[in-house]
Amino acid sequence: MSKNSVIIVAAGKGKRMNSSISKQFLQIKNKPILYYTLSKFSTHESIDEIVLVTLEDKIEVCGDIIDKYNINKVSKIVPGGKERQDSVYNGLKAVSKDCEVVLIHDAARPFVTSDIIENGIRYTNQYGAAACGVIPKDTIKIKNEKGFAIDTPNREDLFIVQTPQCFNYNIILSCHEKLKKHNKKVTDDTMVLENYGKSVYLYEGSYSNIKITTPEDLILGEQILEKLT
């Protein structure tokens, strides 16, 4: 029977947080951010396994969090790579071979909802690839190299992409292998498919599905958690 697997990418160092502690290990309400992220997927009935990708020297720390909070479905903890795309590739190689849909998610994005996860799987089964996100609230400007505004895109045509980003496993693995062979750089996994002419369906995420990257995000995260509990 085919599986739905999730790769949690927790290999970032969080330089923008101005902290010696990696952002995924910082705490909200006395629990690490990683706990909230892992628990969202481990308790979701459509998720069969979790592969956690982290810094090599943090594998033991992650294992302790998993044990302390009795988090299920984590099949492997694997070391990350130099860049995020290398970490994702390591995760892709570690998932079960009977995986059909793989979700790739930021460890520092702890407020993903059950509906976002379920819709990602559903749309991937329908279209082969899907990513959640939101329409920007602010007006977006395009500027030239001198710093002057030259265009104002219609906000309805713009999309702030979040995670999870969800894919047919064989498609995303094949594209990552090509990316590695051609030595191309990307900033997220939808770009991996775009590089090879594949389309990604974009569906509604949530403005609360933030990635915690700055001290201000930690404060906002506490407020979001209070509303959710």
Curated annotation (Swiss-Prot):
GO terms for molecular function: 2-C-methyl-D-erythritol 4-phosphate cytidylyltransferase activity. Pfam families: IspD. Keywords: Isoprene biosynthesis, Nucleotidyltransferase, Transferase. The keyword Transferase applies. It catalyses: 2-C-methyl-D-erythritol 4-phosphate + CTP + H(+) = 4-CDP-2-C-methyl-D-erythritol + diphosphate. Pathway: Isoprenoid biosynthesis; isopentenyl diphosphate biosynthesis via DXP pathway; isopentenyl diphosphate from 1-deoxy-D-xylulose 5-phosphate: step 2/6. InterPro entries: IspD, IspD/TarI, IspD/TarI_cytidylyltransf_bact, ISPD_synthase_CS, Nucleotide-diphossugar_trans. It comes from the Bacteria. The record marks 155, 211 as: Positions MEP for the nucleophilic attack. The record marks 16, 23 as: Transition state stabilizer. CDD domains: CDP-ME_synthetase (cd02516). The keyword Transmembrane does not apply. GO terms for biological process: isopentenyl diphosphate biosynthetic process, methylerythritol 4-phosphate pathway. Catalyzes the formation of 4-diphosphocytidyl-2-C-methyl-D-erythritol from CTP and 2-C-methyl-D-erythritol 4-phosphate (MEP). Belongs to the IspD/TarI cytidylyltransferase family. IspD subfamily. NCBIfam families: ispD (TIGR00453), PRK00155.1-3 (NF001183). HAMAP family: IspD. This is 2-C-methyl-D-erythritol 4-phosphate cytidylyltransferase.
